[in-house]
Amino acid sequence: IAEQLGLSKFVSVQNPYSLLNRTYEIGMSEIAKYEGVGLLAYSPLAFGYLTGKFRNGARPANARVTLFSRFSRYSNPESEWATEQYAQLAERHGLTPTQLALAFIKQQFFVTSTIIGATNLDQLKENIQAFEIDLSEDVLQGIQAIHQQQPNPAP
């Protein structure tokens, strides 16, 4: 339509994308690549769940999930199981859960940028460092194995 009307075409879309929500891969990534549209991945840490700070039912006092408890997309049993599996995978490979989650997103061919949301300097540093990591084939296979057992628990 943009071509026919002489308008600028879309060059990016902003969709949720994380280890817990990979629905973008189902059709959208292929179309986006074909059309030259990049993904600005938002909520890459799944509201903080993929950082590991909510493991074992923890609820830090100032966390968004604690302050806004009605946001339960990531607190269902399937998401909690997958989150724990990803955290354990990260630990087995000497990574933090945050590093695993962000490095995975960085390595997807259709992602052009990732929207991060740090609330302090330490989080910002960890987020930035994660983009310097290239996950090994072994780690990527581990991620895929978890995804196959529990695909998209928080779409």
Whereabouts are the PLM-identified features?
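Substrate/cofactor-recognition hotspot
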Residues: 153
